[in-house]
């Protein structure tokens, strides 16, 4: 069974249950409590410290990204590079790529400018999805990268002129 079918099945069976959780490491939890107790003690901090999405939302975001890729002409077998930090949105983007039949090419978030360019060329990616943390590394090579590739920006803040904004 393809992994995208497993996502669809989990969506049908557990739609409103939590699928993914992101913990914000910049706001470390200092109390040894359960999440329910933590919410009772400090409701405003828990929301900032922890983000989550349900199976329904996960699947919806994956479908939305898959449809965007299809609208832009990405076909089965083409390659989509993913250059994002570990975040809640990473997996829906990954599954969106798989739903199109394209191949996901995860890039290491530690790559510098030259390594990103080398890997993008070596893997012959047709699309690069990147986050705000990588604008500085991509800017020097943006003209070369965007010449024959789609560039999708995902994140907060302004989207660079050489990319298309994709913020769900």
Regions found by a protein language model. Give the residues of each.
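Structural core segment of the AMP-binding/adenylate-forming
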Residues: 5-7, 71-72, 99-167
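Conserved AMP-binding/adenylate-forming core of the ANL superfamily
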Residues: 19-87, 91-94, 112-117, 167-168
């Amino acid at each position: 069974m393809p992994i995208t079918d497993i996502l669809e099945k989990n969506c049908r069976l557990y739609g409103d249950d939590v699928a993914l959780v992101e913990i914000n490491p910049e706001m470390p939890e200092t109390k040894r409590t359960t999440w329910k107790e933590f919410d009772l003690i400090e409701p405003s901090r828990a929301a900032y410290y922890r983000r989550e999405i349900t199976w329904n939302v996960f699947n919806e975001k994956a479908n939305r990204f898959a449809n965007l890729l299809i609208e832009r002409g990405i076909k089965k077998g083409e390659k989509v590079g993913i250059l994002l930090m570990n975040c809640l949105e990473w997996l829906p983007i990954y599954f969106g790529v798989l739903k199109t039949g394209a191949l996901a090419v995860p890039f290491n978030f530690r790559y510098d400018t030259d390594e990103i360019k080398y890997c993008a060329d070596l893997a012959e990616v047709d699309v690069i999805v990147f986050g705000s943390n990588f604008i500085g590394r991509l800017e020097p090579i943006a003209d070369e990268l965007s010449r024959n590739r789609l560039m999708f920006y995902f994140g907060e803040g302004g989207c660079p002129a050489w990319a298309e904004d994709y913020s769900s």
